[in-house]
Amino acid sequence: MASVWVRDALSSRLQLVRVAPGAAALDLLSQAGTAIPLTDFYITCNGHLADLEEKLQDGRTYSIVPRLCGGKGGFGSMLRALGAQIEKTTNREACRDLSGRRLRDVNHEKAMAEWIKKQADREAEKEQRRLERLQRKLAEPKHYFTDPEYHKQCHDMSERLEEAVIKGLQASSSSMASAESDDTRKRKKDMYSSKGTPGKKKCFWTGLEGLETSSSSDSASDSDLDESPCSSSSSSSDSKYYENIKERLQSPESQSSPEELGQGSSDGSHQMLEGHSSSDRSHQMLEGQASCSGSDQMLEGPSSSAGAQWQSSSKGTELVQESQSIPVESEQNMESQNSSDESKQTAFNNSGINVECENVTSPGSTGQDGQTPNDGVRPASPSIPISKQELQQPSNAETSPIDLLAFKTAAELEALGLEKLKLELGALALKCGGTLQERAARLFSVRGLPRDQIDPSLFAKPAKGKKK
């Protein structure tokens, strides 16, 4: 009898079984005595699948193993698909090796080691390329520029450049000097021209009052309109006139009796003349008439109690009528004339304010028999000096604030003019720009309103300071 070891399929117990000689492995399944069909078991011998018809050998170990319960199948196809994907991928750097290191890090270390090994080779190749480049440059033919003509031209050009710069500086300095001399000549010419070009020589006519013609009087009036009262030409003619008067008064021929002196000092009518004069007004002034036709007359020329002067700067015709007087009176009249010139200049500066003609006649202006003293020569009526305060009164009235309630419409405010409206708007801290109609409408809109009721958009913006 043979003895074999048999491992049970259900309990996995190993037991010794005695079998008859020549028994097969199928006999072990029949001895198990299970209700499970024999087809659901198979036998292995020492880990190898044994055939059911194989004879049992003594001392061997046989195991009865149940078969696995299979499903409907299809799991193999899934394994095949997964295996195909595994075979297709080529990037396994995210995987780890058996030591737990990522393959990416391992590959980097290998590449770095190889690069360090090849560093010496790279340096050698670089040096070799540099030497080859130097050899190629040395092999090329060298060019030496030794043209003497070229060097000569360069030297000549540098010298010519220096000479041209020196000439340019000299020309610029000479042009500046000529410009300064031209300015000096122009200033001298202007200074000489400001003194005025004298026309004909002054002539003293006596007893020829009726010889002046209408043309000469018209030219005189036109020249008076064109002549500025504060021009340098009038001042130079005044100074020459006074010097001539002094010389004539100091001469022995001009001495007269005390009766004539007293009579001459009391004669003459005082007039204040300003405005535009005509030929009729010049006749009246020369003939000493006391009446005025009611129109404004321009204050003409330097006048004194010693005589009257009628001048025309355009044609150079001058008519001078002079009476004998003492030097003391002439000096006093000169002082009064200077004050009257200043008042005239102030009056013209104050927008040409016209002063009405006032005639003051003295009872001793004419003789008892109607004859004029000094051999029929009528003395010119002297002009009364006008004080600065009297002439400044109208200008002060202009700058004084106006009463807006006196104006009924904005059109009436337009008559004040742009400058006056600008001053009034500036006094109220309002916007003062725009046309005449806009300024008048803006000023009329705030008529009679207190400051807190005025539209804020009408106020002018405060001036911004400069940024530092």
Swiss-Prot record:
Disulfide bonds: none annotated. InterPro entries: RNA_Proc_DNA_Dmg_Regulator (IPR051421), SDE2-like_dom (IPR053822), SDE2/SF3A3_SAP (IPR025086), Sde2_Ubi (IPR053821). One of its GO terms (cellular component) is nucleus. Upon binding to PCNA, the N-terminal UBL (ubiquitin-like) propeptide is cleaved at Gly-71 by an unidentified deubiquitinating enzyme; the resulting mature SDE2 is degraded by the DCX(DTL) complex in a cell cycle- and DNA damage dependent manner. The keyword Transferase does not apply. Pfam families: SDE2 (PF22782), SDE2_2C (PF13297), Sde2_N_Ubi_vert (PF22781). Residues 240-250 have a biased composition (Basic and acidic residues). Residues 345-374, 384-397 have a biased composition (Polar residues). A motif (PIP-box) lies at residues 33-46. Keywords: Cell cycle, Cell division, Coiled coil, Cytoplasm, DNA replication, DNA-binding, Mitosis, mRNA processing, mRNA splicing, Nucleus, Ribosome biogenesis, RNA-binding. One of its GO terms (biological process) is endonucleolytic cleavage of tricistronic rRNA transcript (SSU-rRNA, 5.8S rRNA, LSU-rRNA). One of its GO terms (molecular function) is DNA binding. The keyword Coiled coil applies. Residues 112-143 form a coiled coil. Residues 228-239, 251-266, 303-314, 329-340 have a biased composition (Low complexity). The record marks G71, K72 as: Cleavage. Residues 1-71 form a propeptide. Residues 169-197, 212-397 are annotated as: Disordered. The PIP-box (PCNA interacting peptide) motif mediates both the interaction with PCNA and cleavage of the SDE2 precursor by a deubiquitinating enzyme. The SAP domain is necessary for specific binding to DNA. Belongs to the SDE2 family. This is Splicing regulator SDE2. It comes from Xenopus tropicalis. The gene is sde2.
